[in-house]
Amino acid sequence: MATRTVETSDSRQTEALGAELAAALSPGDVVLVQGELGAGKTTLVRGAARALGVTDPVTSPTFSIGHRYRGRDVTVSHLDLYRLAGLHEEEPELLEDYLGPDRIAFVEWPEQRSPELRDARLLVTLTHQGGEHRRIEVCERERLPGDASLELSG
């Protein structure tokens, strides 16, 4: 697995990193986004969604569990599993609605450990460093030859 660590000093930089990550994603990809409350998870997803052509407001799905947004060429799913023990336990149909081969999914609070998330493309961990500063670690799982890959050296 390739890993990259980035330091950001404001929300614009965090959104820019999300946009950079989005450029390497394809329909069917799942990105796990973890970090404490207020770490910038939704900010990162907002940047990715904008880069994928989403024009609607991108907000935290904490109270609704998930949002779907229409991008230029792909639907973007944004799930928050904070209140769920697992996708199948609460609402099994969420898998079909939010995780599918025709969409890109971002899943906040993946610590809830749903087995359906084991094939996720990326794990992104955000950590507060004081003020607006964040340390963001991006871990890419192995890809097959010919798949788009991120430049994670640095």
What label would you give each PLM region?
Residues 54-69:
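Short beta-strand-centered segment that lines the nucleotide-binding/catalytic pocket of NTP-utilizing
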Residues 41:
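Conserved lysine of the Walker
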Residues 2-4, 88-90, 94-154:
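Short phosphate-coordinating micro-motif centered on Lys-Gly-acidic
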Residues 23-27:
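Phosphate-binding P-loop
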Residues 31-33:
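Hydrophobic anchor at the beta1->P-loop junction of P-loop NTPases
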Residues 2-17:
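N-terminal pre-Walker A segment at the start of P-loop NTPase domains
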